[in-house]
Amino acid sequence: MPEQPDGIWIIASDARTLFANAAMAEILGVPASELIGKPSFDYVFPEDAPAAQKLFDSKQRGDTNPFRFKLRRQDGSPIWVDVQGTPMRNAAGDFIGIVGTFSISARQE
């Protein structure tokens, strides 16, 4: 199986999508243009929302540790991804969002 390119997802401090590349759109099963402005939590299963919020909050505090997470594709199916997220800050040091790379996990949970 050929290696898939990583998805890149840039998420604002209010969790809205600022940018998603074609690979990220493919992971989520939605056109990239439809992701812009959409809440990133729309792609999280409701039962996983508290864990997703904790991860988002940890990135806001500066955590850069990678993690594995289950996303909800547009068709409702689950997909496990390995995520490397880095907080973005403005010149004043204020948190403005997260840039993340997402790769399809070789191992399903």
Model-derived features with residue positions:
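PAS/PAS-like sensory domains
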Residues: 6, 58-68, 82
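PAS/PAS-like sensory domain cap-loop motif
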Residues: 24-35
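PAS/Per-ARNT-Sim sensory domains
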Residues: 45-57
